[in-house]
């Protein structure tokens, strides 16, 4: 077989390619003027049962502020950065100015929102872009909340004010390569040494980890065998965080692999309130509610996009909205959004009155994320060929829902949490083989 020289290969490629092969893509307004892309975000049309009336004036104001910021600052750029799998760091000050980082934490420069207001803000961010909502959720409802619930007074005063302004960013590292759903079996270790601790181990799928200023690391105390929590600073000797490539969902989120090799953490940065795996549950109880509101917001955005698209796009001489099949799918999506919102709202009220159980939170996250997948699938059908373009939101949202369906407890694990609560029987491990 003859081996072509570089010059010959270049010549052959030139012969194969057309004269217009390397031209840049058309602007969407030129290529497809028949419908408006998501860079100009559609108005909200999904609140069919007027759930906004259930919100307090404060909660309504937060919704309005976040919606305006996301539509103005994020919608025009999100497709570009999603495609590049990069986070738009230049908008971080804008996200900080929304005043939602820190959520329900009171004091220390945090907003002290109600759980409902925090949830509404989460949904409004996710309505436009799921990656931005995950960035905020990891930073606020996991990283900051762990310091607020489990940290010392000195740690709260030192770290929370800067985090609340998004001047610094946090991540939360629990998951490991060998321990996802079985997080309580984590293998990262913390060994007591003079003046502090030596951390060794590996974490995976950690959002914000490649650029976070503070990393909340959970490790097993080699003396007590219990789970402890630590605040690790970026660039600590022995710490390395590298980006996980080739994701198909939440592409703007910088998920990373974290390697810890004899990372020294001073005693002052050990979280005194984390002394067992159960202590992480105080944080996860709140974050799981917030995660349930992400697919609510995503589904709102999908519905809004499809509602506008069906009225703009014409086939057979009429808007797509004029056809019975399309109306049926659109109404099914609308019904899903109403039911999802109502379940999410009730979860918030149960939490605010101290009645919410882990099983209720798990059922909410599992059922809502499942209905969101159905909503995204219907939306993809309604948009036809444009349903596979990130420019029209639905394809992007379709992909972004997949990791959300999995993190903070897979659908199956969350059903087992609820199942344990309603039956009194834990079924996380294989049952003993029957002798029958």
Swiss-Prot record:
Q: SUPFAM superfamilies, from UniProt?
A: Acyl-CoA dehydrogenase C-terminal domain-like (SSF47203), Acyl-CoA dehydrogenase NM domain-like (SSF56645)
Q: Which Pfam families match?
A: Acyl-CoA_dh_1, Acyl-CoA_dh_M, Acyl-CoA_dh_N
Sample GO molecular function, one term: acyl-CoA oxidase activity
GO CC, alphabetical: cytosol; glyoxysome; peroxisome
The record, for InterPro entries, names:
ACX4-like (IPR045008), Acyl-CoA_DH_CS (IPR006089), Acyl-CoA_Oxase/DH_mid-dom (IPR006091), Acyl-CoA_Oxase/DH_mid-dom_sf (IPR046373), AcylCo_DH-like_C (IPR036250), AcylCo_DH/oxidase_C (IPR009075), AcylCoA_DH/ox_N (IPR013786), AcylCoA_DH/ox_N_sf (IPR037069)
How is this protein's function tied to pH?
A: Optimum pH is 8.5-9.0.
Give the E.C. number(s): 1.3.3.6
Cofactor(s) essential for the protein: FAD
Q: Where is this motif: Microbody targeting signal?
A: 434-436
Residues binding an acyl-CoA are 181-184, 288, 409
Sorted alphabetically, the keyword list is:
Acetylation, FAD, Fatty acid metabolism, Flavoprotein, Glyoxysome, Lipid metabolism, Oxidoreductase, Peroxisome
Q: What induces it?
A: Induced by dehydration and abscisic acid (ABA).
Q: Which domain of life is it from?
A: Eukaryota
List positions binding FAD. Answer: 172-175, 181, 207, 313-315, 324, 381, 385, 410-412, 428
Compartments (UniProt record): Glyoxysome; Peroxisome
Tell me the tissue specificity. Answer: Particularly abundant in etiolated cotyledons. Also present in flowers, roots and siliques, but not detected in green cotyledons, rosette leaves and stems.
**What is the stated purpose of this protein?**
Catalyzes the desaturation of short-chain acyl-CoAs to 2-trans-enoyl-CoAs. Active on butyryl-CoA (C4), hexanoyl-CoA (C6), and octanoyl-CoA (C8). Has no activity as acyl-CoA dehydrogenase or on crotonyl-CoA (an unsaturated C4:1 carbocyclic ester) or glutaryl-CoA (a dicarboxylic ester). Peroxisomal fatty acid beta-oxidation is essential for embryo development. Acts as a suppressor of transcriptional silencing. Required for nuclear histone acetylation and DNA demethylation at some endogenous genomic loci.
**Assembly mode:** Homotetramer.
Family, per entry:
Belongs to the acyl-CoA dehydrogenase family.
Protein's name in the database? Acyl-coenzyme A oxidase 4, peroxisomal
Q: Which organism is it from?
A: Arabidopsis thaliana
């Amino acid at each position: 077989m003859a081996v072509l020289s570089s010059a010959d290969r270049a010549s052959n490629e030139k012969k194969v390619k057309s004269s217009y092969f390397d031209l840049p893509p058309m602007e969407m307004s030129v290529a497809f003027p028949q419908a408006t892309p998501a860079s100009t975000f559609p108005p909200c049309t999904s609140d069919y049962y007027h759930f906004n009336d259930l919100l307090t004036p404060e909660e309504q104001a937060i919704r309005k502020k976040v919606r305006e910021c996301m539509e103005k600052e994020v919608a025009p750029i999100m497709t570009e950065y999603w495609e590049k799998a990069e986070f738009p760091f230049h908008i971080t000050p804008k996200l900080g100015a929304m005043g939602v980082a820190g959520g329900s934490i009171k004091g220390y420069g945090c907003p002290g929102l109600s759980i409902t207001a925090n949830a509404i803000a989460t949904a409004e961010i996710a309505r436009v872009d799921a990656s931005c909502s995950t960035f905020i959720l990891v930073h606020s409802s996991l990283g900051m909340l762990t310091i607020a619930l489990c940290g010392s007074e000195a740690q709260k005063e030192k770290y929370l004010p800067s985090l609340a302004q998004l001047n610094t960013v946090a991540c939360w590292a629990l998951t490991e390569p060998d321990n996802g759903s079985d997080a309580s079996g984590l293998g990262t270790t913390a060994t007591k040494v003079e003046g502090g601790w030596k951390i060794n181990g590996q974490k995976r799928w950690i959002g914000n980890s490649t650029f976070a200023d503070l990393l909340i690391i959970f490790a097993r105390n080699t003396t007590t065998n219990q789970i402890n929590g630590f605040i690790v600073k970026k660039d600590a000797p022995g710490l390395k965080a590298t980006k996980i490539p080739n994701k198909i969902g939440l592409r703007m989120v910088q998920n990373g692999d974290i390697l810890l090799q004899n990372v020294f953490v001073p005693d002052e940065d050990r979280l005194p309130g984390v002394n067992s795996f159960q202590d992480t549950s105080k944080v996860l109880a709140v974050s799981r509610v917030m995660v349930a509101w992400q697919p609510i917001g995503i589904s709102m955005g999908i519905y809004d996009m499809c509602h506008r698209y069906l009225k703009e796009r014409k086939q057979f001489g009429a808007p797509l909205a004029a056809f019975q099949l399309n109306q049926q799918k659109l109404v099914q999506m609308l019904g899903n959004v109403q039911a999802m919102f109502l379940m999410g709202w009730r979860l918030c009220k149960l939490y605010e009155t101290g009645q919410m159980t882990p099983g209720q939170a798990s059922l909410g996250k599992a059922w809502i994320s499942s209905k969101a997948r159905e909503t995204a699938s219907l939306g993809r059908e309604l948009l036809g060929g444009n349903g596979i373009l990130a420019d029209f939101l639905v394809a992007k949202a379709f992909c972004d829902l997949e990791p959300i369906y999995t993190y903070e407890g897979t659908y199956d694990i969350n059903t087992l949490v609820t199942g344990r609560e309603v039956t009194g029987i834990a079924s996380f491990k294989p049952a003993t083989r029957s002798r029958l």
